Amino acid sequence: MLSVPEMILYEDRVNSFGGWSKQLRPNKDTLAPAGFFYTGMGDKVKCFACGLEVIDWDPTDNPWTEHGKFSGDCLYLKMTGAIVKSKDATTTNPSTSNPFTGANNQQAVIPLTAPPPLFQQPPPPTTTSAPAVDVAPAPPTFGFNTTSTSKTTNYAFPARATAPPPITSVPKPMFGNGFVFNSSPNKQTALFGKPPGNGQDVCGNMPSTTNNSNKQQGVFGINMTGGTNQQQPTSGMFGVKPVVAQPFKF
């Protein structure tokens, strides 16, 4: 876990040396790459990863060497590769190249001149256009006004039923305005009401008004008056007295 994660970026550590004296050596160009940032007090610097604080710098001190001397297990040094596990891999003269002496020293610090890419400022974001992507054809519109089958979705829809043409005129009735006349002179039947005009049928005949012996039968339950051969009315729905016209002769 990092000690001061706010200083993980190299640029932030460099900017922390704003109050660092120009006469002090080493300077920000060598301290910041080694993981140190300035604390603002004297010449004390601190590692952002392990939290090591170092003071009393000499002009000949190497920040990488001093860092590894006091904090060899620093995560930043291990990740940057500044620590070499075998001191035999450094040089044939350990006394001059290896700052560590003694039988227990098994590490040598190799100074670095620049921080690794992992701890540097990330590059600014760039805008790139997305590659063209083939768009699949749109699915068919759901409805009932198509007679074809889609090849992509394999959906079939029934055709919409064709409505009959609108009625523009009504034919006239064959036997007058709502009347049907039987061929028998004694059984005329009125269906809807009075005959057209002044009581004439479609042939122009006037209805009979004489009191003959054979009275016609009313359909709607009303007896015809007069005559000697009175007939009983049939059962009907409405008490309407029909007007009887002469039969239509074919």
UniProtKB/Swiss-Prot annotation:
BIR repeats lie at residues 13-78. GO terms for biological process: regulation of cell cycle. It comes from the Viruses. InterPro entries: BIR_rpt, IAP. Gene3D superfamilies: Inhibitor Of Apoptosis Protein (2mihbC-IAP-1), Chain A (1.10.1170.10). May act as an apoptosis inhibitor. PANTHER family: DEATH-ASSOCIATED INHIBITOR OF APOPTOSIS 2, INHIBITOR OF APOPTOSIS. This is Putative apoptosis inhibitor ORF99. It comes from Ostreid herpesvirus 1 (isolate France).
